[in-house]
């Protein structure tokens, strides 16, 4: 069985790919990367609606790539962003309603 690369290794490879393709230069507008992310989210939603696991896997991966590149364009790492989100949600109170977790301030 083929072993998957860890997320940190993949982030480094994606960063090198993005740099090689000019996505990390000062002339690039991060807003364009955000538009690419929205496109990929749409494709991911389509895969989910049509119950296509292979396309869903690809879509989720594409979204992660877009987020990694967007973070790097702003001089941040995906780990830094994820840690900030974790610190915000780890003690969050709320409840599950209709399959979604709603924080207590939204109830």
PLM ranges: what are they?
Residues 1-60, 64-107:
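Flexible "arm" and connector segments at domain edges
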């Amino acid at each position: 069985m083929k072993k998957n690369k860890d997320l940190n290794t993949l982030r480094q490879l994606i960063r090198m790919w993005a740099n090689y393709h000019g996505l990390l230069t000062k002339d690039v507008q991060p807003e364009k990367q955000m538009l690419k992310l929205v496109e990929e989210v749409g494709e991911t939603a389509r895969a989910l609606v049509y119950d296509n696991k292979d396309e869903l896997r690809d879509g989720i991966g594409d979204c992660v790539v877009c987020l990694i590149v967007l973070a790097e364009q702003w001089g941040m790492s995906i780990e830094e962003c994820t840690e900030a989100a974790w610190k915000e949600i780890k003690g969050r109170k709320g409840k599950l309603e209709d399959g979604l977790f709603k924080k207590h301030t939204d109830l």
